[in-house]
Amino acid sequence: MSTQILATSFKNDNIHKIVRPTTNYHPSIWGDRFLHYDIPKEELNYKQGQVEELKEVVRKEIFGEFLCDDWSNRLKLIDVVQRLGLSYHFESEIQNELQHIYNKISINDSNFEHETLHDASIRFRLLRQHGYRVSLDIFDKFKDENGNFKECLASDTVGLLSLYEASHLSCVGENLLDEALSFTTKHLTEFLENNKKEHPNDDPLSKEISRALERPLRKTLVNLHARYFISIYEKDASHNKVLLQLAKLDFNLLQSMHKKELSEISRWWKELDSAHNFPFARNRIVELYIWILGVYYEPQYSFARNILVKIIALSSIADDIYDSYGIFEEHKLLIEAIDRWDKNCMDKLHPEYLQKYYKILLQSFEEFEQEFEKEETYKVYYGKETFKRLLRGYFEEARWLNEGYMPSLEEHLKVSLVTSGYFMLMACSLVGMKSNNIVTKQVFEWLSKDPKIVRASASVCRYMDDVAGHKNEQERNHIPSTIECYMKQYGVSEEEACDEMNRRVVIAWKEINEEFLKPTEAASPILVRALNLARVMDLLYKNGDNYTQVGKVTKDSVAVLLIDPIP
């Protein structure tokens, strides 16, 4: 809801009354709930010891030599391990298994000539996920003489569900997988409609299909899906008891660790006194933690998460300064100070909220630098430069609004892909990563050229954000969105423009998939950050802006990941 408020501005020692357009964002719905949490070190060590013991049992049982020739069962077990959120424990074992299977294809594809649709789809999906260029020929046996998928497959519901999931690993130009998506979506939807009449309380398969149609595996946060899948796997009579026990212990252990992280970040946020210093800004530190937990949930990235949550919180305040509170003269003062990045600029910043923001920003990055050895401070430098670039983008958009300028879509995207924040978040996600020399200066230089996978992830963010927020933005004076630019440039309706943005999201996902196929420009742990950033958008913006207006999706995600342990 838009309102007008009075504010004061300082210029030439004169006080002027200013009418600000601003948006009334609802306060944090969590209060101080996550402010205090601790887990005794003895308890933490005990739980970690349990996990380590079970890992060794699983390593022998699941990845033992006795499974070496049972490729179908091996793939299904790998799939289960991934769905349970445990793959980060067994990365080398999974990679070795998949390499072995891929080599078998290269030597003699007839090894797989009798596989079912379910098996073929799992094989395709898992190999593609791990960067192997698997041919679409794998699905030829399931097509009729006219090149269409055989109608008899409509009765193979499990196979259809697997093919549906596999179709989301498509790249640009792979029409067969587009056909597979349409074919499976049609028949899975029909299955749900027919099954409702026979099983009104929903059977497990129907629940799994409903969830997949809403959020396919490729677009799902790993840790969020793990909680859901644990409850499904537990009801499977053939489940591996040790694997299930490990999944439960690991999930609860991670949840405890994440709650401790959030309590520390919440105290940092409270010390900033954001609600008082920046009352116009969205108070969403819990939601931002969920955002970054989607980027990486694994325990080895705790340090990186701490840095990235603070950076995204600072960028969210800046977004609200430029988008919904500050006036253009203030925007200019702030960006000039940001470009100089010098404490001596402080006295030139008025009103006081700009000084406070600038001081917090500079202090935060100084504190980040202090966490690194001298030879690694370059990481913070690159993060700082991408943050500056983000705010320059905010300023350019503010200039459009101030001048009443409507850019072309192409001109808009040169700026708005930057202001999506994803170029900045991608670079800053690597600042705190400690991954065996994977993150180097060369990687940051590669990122500075806006590689295709990062542009694609930023595109998912930009288009989904604009579609989700378009209607609410009409209630106030606002920066033109991609939707409005497209409508004006091509003379189309709002609905047609939204359809085009959604179509571009589909293409961006295909580009992300393509960039994972070997040989890749960067190591997998780096590429996964771009993928996960896109996944967060699918969670929070698929059905409206669940960050600005915290809705059921966000509340449920917080409850699952940070409140409710697995019994």
UniProtKB/Swiss-Prot annotation:
Comment on protein domains: The Asp-Asp-Xaa-Xaa-Asp/Glu (DDXXD/E) motif is important for the catalytic activity, presumably through binding to Mg(2+).
Q: In which pathway does it act?
A: Secondary metabolite biosynthesis; terpenoid biosynthesis
Question: Cofactor binding mode, per the note?
Answer: Binds 3 Mg(2+) or Mn(2+) ions per subunit.
Give the first-level EC class, as a single word: lyase
SUPFAM superfamilies cross-referenced by the UniProt entry:
Terpenoid cyclases/Protein prenyltransferases, Terpenoid synthases
Q: Which reaction does it catalyse?
A: (2E,6E)-farnesyl diphosphate = alpha-humulene + diphosphate; (2E,6E)-farnesyl diphosphate = (+)-valencene + diphosphate; (2E)-geranyl diphosphate = beta-myrcene + diphosphate; (2E,6E)-farnesyl diphosphate = allo-aromadendrene + diphosphate
Q: InterPro entries recorded for this chain?
A: Isoprenoid_synthase_dom_sf, Terpene_cyclase-like_1_C, Terpene_cyclase_plant_C1, Terpene_synth_N, Terpene_synth_N_sf, Terpene_synthase-like, Terpene_synthase_metal-bd, Terpenoid_cyclase/PrenylTrfase
Q: What is this protein called?
A: Allo-aromadendrene synthase TPS4FN
Is-annotated flag, keyword Nucleotide-binding? Answer: no
Q: Which residues bind Mg(2+) 2?
A: 319, 323
**Recorded superkingdom:** Eukaryota
Q: Where does Mg(2+) 1 bind?
A: 319, 323
Q: Which Gene3D superfamilies match?
A: Farnesyl Diphosphate Synthase (1.10.600.10), Terpene synthase, N-terminal domain (1.50.10.130)
Species of origin reads Cannabis sativa
